[in-house]
Amino acid sequence: MSFKILGTGSYAPEHVVTNDDLSALVDTNDEWITQRIGVRSRHISETETNVDMAVKAAERALENAGISADELDLIIATTITGDTLSPGTGCMVQNRIGAHCPAFDLAAACSGFLFALETAAGFLSRGAYNRVLVVSAERMSGIIDWTDRGTCCIFGDGAGAAVLGKGDGLVASHLMTKGGDDVITIPTRYDRSPWYKNEISEITSVHMNGRETYKFAVMAMSDNIKDLMASAGVAGEDVALVIPHQANYRIINEARRRI
C-alpha cells in the first residue's frame, strides 16, 4: 500500500514582479530572461510570511479533500525559508489551522515536497496514521540577492499542499541525493558563541553556480525519470503527462530530449 491524494491546494501572493520590473534593478531585460530561463513573471510576497502562505495552501487542500483540520493525523512541512528556526513551520501551521496532530519539518529545498510525500507514505503504509497533510512553502524573495541577475530572475514565493490518505495511487517512486556545497548554497549566520573560532561567511543570500546547476539538474531529472519508469515498468509512450520542477525552461527541454 502507498497512498492516494485526497485533495490539493496552493497559494501564490497577489503581487507580481515582471521581467521588466527586474530590469530596473539589474542589467537584464525580458528577452534575456525569457530565452534563457523561460520565466516572464514571479509572485513575490509583500506582507505574507512563510507560514501565512503555508496556512492558505493547507486550508485549500483540506477544503478540496472535504475534511477538517481535526481529522488530520500528521502534518509534514517542507521549507528552507522558515520564519523561525523554532517553532517549525509545521508546528505553526498546526496551530493556525486548528489541528491537534503531530507536526514536523523537513528541509530538502527544491525536492522537499517529494521527500515529504515519501515520508508520509511510510507512516501511512505501517498503519500509524490515516490522513497526512504535506505542505511546502518558500519565501525565496527574502534570501535572494536582488543585484544578482543569475538568481533573482529565477525564484518566487508560494506554497502548495496535499492531503494524503491510505490507498494504492502511487505506482513507483525514486529519490536521490548528490551531497555537496559547491553548486547552490544558502549560508546562515546565527553563531553568537564567543568561543567559536571558525570564520563566519559574509554571504547571506542564495549563491549559485549556474553552469553546474544546469548540468546537474539535466542529469538528475532525466536519469531519475528513466530509473523511475524502469522500476514502474512504464515506457515513454505510456506516460500521459510529466510535471517537472520548473526552475528553468532550458533544463526542462534538455531533460525531455534525453528522456
Name each region found by the language model.
Residues S125-A159:
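Flexible, glycine-rich active-site loops centered on histidine and acidic residues
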Residues I5-G7, E48-A108, A235-I252:
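Conserved beta-ketoacyl condensing-enzyme motif
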Residues S10-Y11, T78-D83, A108-F113, S136-S141, ...:
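Acidic, glycine-rich active-site loops and adjacent beta-strand->loop/helix elements
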Residues T34-R36, R40-D52, T79-V132, R256-I259:
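Conserved catalytic cysteine-centered active-site region
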Residues T28-N29, N50-A65, F216-S231:
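Short, well-ordered amphipathic alpha-helical segments that serve as non-catalytic structural scaffolds
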Residues I200-I259:
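A contiguous, well-structured pocket-lining segment that forms one wall/lid of small-molecule binding clefts
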Residues V16-V17, S86-G88, I144-T147:
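Short acidic, glycine/serine/threonine-rich loops at helix termini
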Residues M1-T47, D148-K215, M219, D223:
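Condensing-enzyme catalytic core mediating Claisen C-C bond formation in acyl metabolism
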